[in-house]
Each structure stands twice: as structure tokens, then as C-alpha cells.
């Protein structure tokens, strides 16, 4: 077991959810808990959000859906964003998972199993309005409009789409996607709709429709929501080095003075990127401490020379993620996004849930 601890504040996640629900007013708000709840624990987060009346949970795959269903029981809706495939259709039916159908082939597969089971099978349809990743194309949507038998045997519960650049509020592409979505929905007047991801919630009520699907904002990856995550690591080694001493693999850092160097037990095997070598920072008692030398598989070194001697000791905790170094701030150092920082949190870390 790692000496490092990831602390997840479920109360903060619940408060973020309630903030988003308040913004959405009359629309339902679900939760994206794919990738194990963005690395924070899909089961624990979902159970906490159920307490706030969340009933729609979005996962990527059938495997994620089965794990969540086993933990949550039948009283929630679990939606599988990657859709249905021949190999997992029966599993989706057995575990009451609802696929988001992304192309005509998936519709055909789901119809086939509807006939096999001789009953309606629930589904969402995903219309591609411009992200050009998953979703039915304009040609496929036109086929559905002109031939409703293509949906025979299916209980179509929602039509969804996904915004490509919702975090840029003034980007005109958001409105382009909204208008395309509305144009398609005219042909399905009795079907509920969902468009807003986290960023979409903040674009205004026109984007909310019947159901919003936040992920990032629940986990503090938005200026208006709070970070629920703290990652701490203890000092496990201390050494006094003289001027011109080399630190770590490839000797990429050389001391410019007599220095006190501390070692922390985490590295790239724990999802702490090697790109933080010689440019990241951690915090000890609110003071910034630089990472020096290469990030290695299991260890990083930090320069604690400028800390008061009373704060430099074995077992002293350094904050890697927290109030002083949020996932978004850390991500900006190495040119990535906070999502990647969270989903990369290693399995060796101890998880502690509070709130």
C-alpha cells in the first residue's frame, strides 16, 4: 500500500452538484462517472449523489455499467455512452443498462435483441452536431426521420448531443451546435433531450433541455465549483547536499548552493507525469517547494532548503493536489487539462472519503 493518500471530499462534490442543479432550475442533472468517477471512485461518488436525488449516471462502457449497477441496485438509470456491441448486448439487458446508440449499426444490434427478447428495449440516441467523435451523422439522422421503422422495438427515452467547445462561452460554434440540435429535435417532438455537459450548463438555459450531464464541474474542474481532492505524500528521506551536487536520473538538476533535499514516494507509475521534472511544485504548510531532478517511477525529490528547520522532518506531509495546487493549476504547468490529472491518479494511492 502506498504511503500517499488521496482524500476525496464527498460533501464538496454534493455541493457542486447542488450548485449545478440550481443553475439548471427545472432540468434534471445527471452525473458523468465514467473512468471510475474521473479517478475519484464512481461507486462512492454515485452513492453520495443519490442522496441529492441524482438518478442518471453516465459511464463509458458496459463493464463500468455492470460494476455500478452491482453497487447501486436498480433504482437509478445507468447510461452507457459507447453504446452497444454484439458481444455485450445481453449483458446490457441483464443489468438493465441503457445504451447511447451512436450509429445505425448499433441501432440494428439493439433492434435485433429487442426482437430476440420480444420486448421494447430502452435507449438514448446520440446525434452528432459537430464534435465529430461519436454520434449519428446527418445522413443517418435523415434516414431515421424518413423511416421510423428503423426505431421499431426501441423505447427511445432521450436524444442527446455533445458540445465541442462549451468552455469558451463566446465561441459561436456553441450556437451552431445548438441550432443543429434544435433542428433535428423538431422531427422528434415527444422525445426528451440532453445537450449540456459541464461547460454547457454555464451557456444558459437554452442549452439545458430536459437533462444536463456534468462531469468535470462536479469534480472542481470549473471556476465556479470547488476542488474536492487532496493528494498528500510524506517525506521518506532527507539529505544535505553541497554546492554542485547532481540530483536524479541523467543529472538534470545541479544544486546552486548547499541544499536540503527531501524525497517523496510517488512517481510516474502513480500517474504523476514525468513532465513535472524540474518544473513542478508541492506545498508544505502553504509554502511552495520546487520539484528538482527527474520524476522517476516511484520517487520525486523536492528542495526544502528555504523551509524553517522545524518543518523539515521525516513524515512531514507535502500537498501535491489541494487548495494551493488544484488539478487545473497543476495541469497548466505541463500543458494538459485537469481531467487528465485526476484520471491519472494511481491505483497505489490510498483513497480516503470524507463528508
Swiss-Prot record:
Q: Which residues catalyse the reaction?
A: 34 (proton acceptor), 249 (proton acceptor)
Identify the enzyme class. Answer: isomerase
| GO terms assigned for molecular function | alanine racemase activity; pyridoxal phosphate binding
InterPro entries associated with the record: Ala_racemase, Ala_racemase/Decarboxylase_C, Ala_racemase_C, Ala_racemase_N, Ala_racemase_pyridoxalP-BS, PLP-binding_barrel
On this chain, the residues bearing N6-(pyridoxal phosphate)lysine are 34
State one Pfam family annotation. Answer: Ala_racemase_N
Q: Where do the annotations place substrate binding? A: 133, 297
Q: Supply one GO CC term from the record.
A: cytosol
Transmembrane residue ranges: none
Q: Name one GO biological process term.
A: D-alanine biosynthetic process
Record EC number: 5.1.1.1
Keywords assigned by UniProt? Isomerase, Pyridoxal phosphate
Catalytic activity field: L-alanine = D-alanine
Copy the pathway line from the protein's UniProt record.
Amino-acid biosynthesis; D-alanine biosynthesis; D-alanine from L-alanine: step 1/1
Which interval of the chain is the signal sequence? none
Which cofactors, if any, are listed as required? pyridoxal 5'-phosphate
The protein's job, in short, is: Catalyzes the interconversion of L-alanine and D-alanine. May also act on other amino acids.
Family recorded in the similarity comment = Belongs to the alanine racemase family.
Question: What's this protein's name?
Answer: Alanine racemase
Give the gene that encodes this protein: alr
Amino acid at each position: 500500500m502506498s504511503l500517499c493518500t488521496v482524500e476525496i471530499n464527498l460533501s464538496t462534490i454534493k455541493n457542486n452538484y447542488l450548485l449545478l442543479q440550481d443553475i439548471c432550475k427545472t432540468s434534471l442533472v445527471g452525473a458523468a462517472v465514467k473512468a471510475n468517477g474521473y479517478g475519484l471512485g464512481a461507486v462512492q461518488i454515485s452513492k453520495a449523489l443519490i442522496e441529492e436525488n441524482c438518478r442518471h449516471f453516465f459511464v463509458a462502457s458496459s463493464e463500468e455499467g455492470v460494476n455500478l449497477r452491482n453497487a447501486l441496485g436498480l433504482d437509478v438509470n445507468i447510461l452507457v455512452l459507447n453504446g452497444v456491441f454484439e458481444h455485450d448486448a445481453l449483458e446490457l439487458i441483464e443489468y438493465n443498462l441503457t445504451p447511447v446508440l451512436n450509429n445505425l449499426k448499433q441501432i440494428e444490434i439493439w433492434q435485433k435483441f429487442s426482437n430476440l427478447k420480444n420486448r421494447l428495449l430502452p435507449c438514448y440516441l446520440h446525434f452528432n452536431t459537430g464534435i465529430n467523435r461519436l454520434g449519428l451523422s446527418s445522413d443517418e439522422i435523415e434516414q431515421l426521420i424518413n423511416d421510423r421503422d428503423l426505431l421499431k422495438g426501441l423505447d427511445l427515452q432521450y436524444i442527446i448531443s455533445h458540445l465541442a467547445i462549451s468552455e469558451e462561452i463566446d465561441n459561436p460554434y456553441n450556437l451552431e451546435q445548438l441550432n443543429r440540435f434544435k433542428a433535428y429535435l423538431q422531427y422528434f417532438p415527444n422525445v426528451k433531450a440532453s445537450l449540456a455537459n459541464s461547460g454547457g450548463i454555464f451557456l444558459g438555459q437554452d442549452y439545458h433541455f430536459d437533462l444536463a450531464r456534468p462531469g468535470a464541474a462536479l469534480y472542481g474542474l470549473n471556476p465556479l465549483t470547488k476542488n474536492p481532492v487532496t493528494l498528500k505524500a510524506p517525506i521518506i528521506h532527507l539529505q544535505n547536499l553541497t554546492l554542485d551536487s547532481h540530483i536524479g536520473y541523467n543529472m538534470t538538476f545541479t544544486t546552486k548552493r548547499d541544499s536540503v533535499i527531501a524525497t517523496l514516494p510517488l512517481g510516474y507509475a502513480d500517474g504523476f507525469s514525468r513532465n513535472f521534472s524540474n518544473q513542478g511544485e508541492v506545498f508544505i504548510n502553504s509554502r511552495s517547494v520546487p520539484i528538482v531532478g527527474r520524476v522517476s517511477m516511484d520517487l520525486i525529490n523536492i528542495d526544502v532548503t528555504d523551509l524553517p528547520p522545524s518543518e523539515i522532518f521525516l513524515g512531514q506531509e507535502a500537498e501535491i493536489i489541494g487548495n494551493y495546487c488544484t488539478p487545473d493549476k497543476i495541469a497548466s504547468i505541463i500543458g494538459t487539462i485537469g481531467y487528465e490529472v485526476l484520471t491519472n491518479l494511481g491505483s497505489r494511492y490510498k483513497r480516503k472519503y470524507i463528508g
